Swiss-Prot record:
<dbReference type="GO" id="GO:0046716">
    <property type="term" value="P:muscle cell cellular homeostasis"/>
</dbReference>
<feature type="repeat" description="ARM 2">
    <location>
        <begin position="346"/>
        <end position="391"/>
    </location>
</feature>
<dbReference type="InterPro" id="IPR000225">
    <property type="entry name" value="Armadillo"/>
</dbReference>
<protein>
    <recommendedName>
        <fullName>GTPase-GDP dissociation stimulator vimar</fullName>
    </recommendedName>
</protein>
<dbReference type="InterPro" id="IPR016024">
    <property type="entry name" value="ARM-type_fold"/>
</dbReference>
<keyword id="KW-0344">Guanine-nucleotide releasing factor</keyword>
<dbReference type="InterPro" id="IPR040144">
    <property type="entry name" value="RAP1GDS1"/>
</dbReference>
<feature type="repeat" description="ARM 3">
    <location>
        <begin position="392"/>
        <end position="432"/>
    </location>
</feature>
<keyword id="KW-0256">Endoplasmic reticulum</keyword>
<keyword id="KW-0677">Repeat</keyword>
<comment type="subunit">
    <text>Interacts with Miro.</text>
</comment>
<comment type="function">
    <text>Probably acts as a GEF (guanine nucleotide exchange factor) for the Rho family of small GTP-binding proteins (G proteins) that stimulates the dissociation of GDP to enable subsequent binding of GTP. May also chaperone the processing and/or trafficking of small GTPases independently of GEF activity. By interacting with Miro, promotes mitochondrial fission in response to high calcium concentrations.</text>
</comment>
<keyword id="KW-0963">Cytoplasm</keyword>
<dbReference type="GO" id="GO:0005886">
    <property type="term" value="C:plasma membrane"/>
</dbReference>
<dbReference type="GO" id="GO:0005741">
    <property type="term" value="C:mitochondrial outer membrane"/>
</dbReference>
<dbReference type="GO" id="GO:0010821">
    <property type="term" value="P:regulation of mitochondrion organization"/>
</dbReference>
<dbReference type="GO" id="GO:0005829">
    <property type="term" value="C:cytosol"/>
</dbReference>
Length: 635
């Protein structure tokens, strides 16, 4: 329709006193216009306000329909944002359901008011001032609609109107909560859940309101019965849009550990498993794949709760997740791994997984996916699970024998920070108490060079810290048992336990440590670790330096290596780092750290070169200033 024709229609509508039938015809022509922007130059609000008050129902209905079409334009939305127009619409909605049961006029009023409210805070504020929110919410009480032919359309536009209104933000959502919106929505959802297929449209146009409230009301917790209904709707529905809404709502609710347990006990994870097994071959579109991932993520989220994890450990879900380790679908495979990683949060579960060969299946999957081009999310999940499995002492030897280290060392070529972080953490947990393995890894030039590189250059603090810690742990677990007797004071707890048991011998193989030190930057890494942010890392650095000092500085037979170590320690300004450590951390030092600090300083003093270096940085005086030592002296 051309602009001139639009102008003519509007002129006729404004200036001609015509019969209701002719008015209706004019309105029908206007509402049939495809481009609402054609009306932007016209001032139509007052004209249409009069028409909405006409005695003729058809005129009122067509006028409301025209307003709904015209206000699809932003310009006209603003022009129709008038108190008297919105008040008239609200008055009309107060009469719903109408005396004759017809929903045609309420449908058009809902459309018109809904379009006016779209991205229009001024209109929403007017509704609030007129206490129209109570009128809008009362529409949710209409559960039986006599006008069967228009029932579906009313349900749709009611949902659209309320959505456009509630999208106005936190204030409107909270006011709706005060007016009992949740009880009204729960009533509708109960009806929908009673027969999901029959009430699909009702649910599709009601659940978005829950989503809006969830986004705008902080810490909105649904009643447990509502969460269970959402779970049941998910199980019964074949509509992907409805499934997506249920999953998103349950995702938000499942942030609560209490809800995780409720959903676990209601069988939600098994429901999702069965649905994914049923539809996995159909996930060929990006939308279907996104829905599948959302469902997978909900299983994992529920398993992050302690109580829900322990409950699900006793259900068939455990075997289902193990079965997914054989899946060729990357999302199901990754979910299976993530699920098992969450199950592996207790020693007893971890030991069971090793005994049942589940650990071997995880290693098999990792062996096929440990390259630079493989899926990063899967790699991260695998390393997380294996890290948990290797923590219990009874598991360590079995996991090492199964080839964990050989499988993950090729992953040093991967430089994705989350994967590297988990890789280093897994190795660190594996070498805990494993002297033979620690000795082997100290000789692994590729590993040590990469650790030095990451300790200096990573933008990811976690990778920097894990690189330093792994080097310190390798030194500690390879040599602490050999040199504990030589420590001048009791310090690190393991040293105390070992010192009474080992023979006073100095005959041990230093080749692993020598090869470690031959890599440029290793001594610097341990020295730099002294001023790490975390006390535990400072302590680990002190222990590593104590071991280096005992192995080389106190042994005449190691004069050449001792000189190299002394030169390197001076070059790295170990005195300056120790001074920084004392100055920054003395107030928070534990007794254990102080003892290890004293051990370290005393051992360094076995070298005249280092005595002079430490004096330059006033280490002796700084040691006296440590509060915990001052307290001992006072006592």
């Amino acid at each position: 329709m051309a602009t001139a024709e639009i102008d003519d229609l509007i002129e006729k509508l404004k200036t001609t006193s015509v019969s209701p039938a002719n008015t209706t015809n004019l309105l029908c022509e206007i509402s049939a216009t495809k481009d609402p922007k054609l009306f932007d130059k016209h001032e139509l609000a007052e004209c249409f306000l009069g028409l909405t008050k006409c005695d003729d129902t058809n005129v009122r209905k067509e006028a409301a329909k025209c307003i709904a079409e015209i206000t699809k334009s932003e310009v006209q939305r603003k022009k129709f944002t008038k108190r008297n127009i919105i008040a008239a619409f609200l008055e009309c909605l107060r009469q719903v359901p109408t005396s004759d049961g017809s929903m045609e006029l309420p449908i058009q009023i809902c459309r018109a008011l809904g379009n006016i409210c779209y991205l229009n805070d001024e209109a929403r504020d007017l509704i609030l001032e007129l206490e129209g929110d109570a009128v809008l919410l009362r529409l949710l009480d209409i559960t039986t609609i006599e006008d069967v032919a228009n029932a579906a359309q009313f349900i749709k536009v009611r949902g659209g109107l309320l959505s456009n209104y509630l999208l106005g933000g936190e204030g409107l959502a909270k006011r709706a909560m005060e007016l009992g919106v949740m009880k009204k929505l729960q009533g509708i959802i109960d009806i929908g859940a009673s027969n999901v297929e029959q009430h699909e449209d009702l649910l599709l146009n009601t659940l978005p309101l829950l989503s809006i409230l969830t986004e705008n009301v902080s810490d909105l917790n649904f009643d447990s019965s509502l969460n269970i209904q959402l779970s049941r709707i998910l199980a019964a529905s074949t509509n992907p849009d409805l499934a997506e809404m249920c999953l998103e709502l349950l995702h938000y609710q499942a942030e609560s550990d209490e809800v995780k347990l409720i959903l676990a006990k209601d069988g939600l994870c098994e429901t999702i498993y069965n649905l994914l097994e049923k539809y996995k071959t159909l996930a060929s579109t990006s939308e279907a794949r996104a829905l599948m991932k959302l469902a997978c993520e909900l299983i994992v989220l529920i398993l992050t709760g302690d109580d829900s994890m322990h409950y699900l450990y006793t259900t068939p879900l455990l075997k289902n997740m193990v079965d997914w380790l054989d899946s060729t679908d990357i999302d199901l495979l990754t979910t299976g791994v993530l699920a098992l990683g969450n199950f592996a949060r207790t020693d007893s579960h971890c030991i069971y997984f090793v005994e049942q060969q589940t650990m071997n299946k995880l290693l098999e999957v990792l062996a096929k996916n440990n390259g630079v081009k493989d899926d990063v999310r899967l790699q991260h999940a695998l390393l997380s699970a294996l890290r948990n499995l290797v923590i219990p002492k009874p598991n360590k030897n079995a996991v090492i024998q199964a080839g964990l280290v050989q499988t993950i060392l090729p992953m040093l070529e991967i430089h994705q920070p989350p994967v590297v972080f988990k890789l280093l953490g897994t190795l660190r947990m594996t070498v805990d108490g494993q002297e033979k393995l620690a000795l082997e890894l100290l000789k692994n030039k590729t590993l040590i060079e990469q650790l030095v590189h990451w300790s200096k250059s990573s933008d990811y603090a976690g990778v920097t810290g894990e690189s330093l810690r792994l080097m310190a742990w390798l030194i500690k677990h390879a040599y602490l048992s050999k040199i504990a007797y030589a420590l001048p004071r009791k310090g690190d707890a393991p040293a105390e336990q070992i010192a009474d048991k080992i023979p006073l011998t100095q005959d041990y193989d230093r080749s692993s440590l020598s090869e470690f030190l031959a890599n440029e930057g290793t001594v610097e890494a341990m020295v730099s670790m002294l001023t790490a942010q975390h006390l535990v890392m400072q302590n680990e650095a002190l222990i590593a330096l104590c071991i280096l000092s005992v192995v080389y500085l106190s042994q005449p037979s190691e004069a050449a290596q001792a000189q190299l170590l002394q030169d390197e320690l001076v070059k790295c300004e170990v005195g300056k780092k120790l001074a920084e450590l004392i100055s920054k951390s003395s107030d928070t030092m534990t007794k254990e750290i102080v003892e290890n600090l004293q051990n370290c300083v005393n051992l360094l003093k076995s070298s005249e070169q280092l005595v002079a270096h430490l004096e330059q940085h006033n280490i002796n005086e700084l040691l006296k200033s440590i509060p915990i030592l001052t307290e001992y002296c006072t006592l």
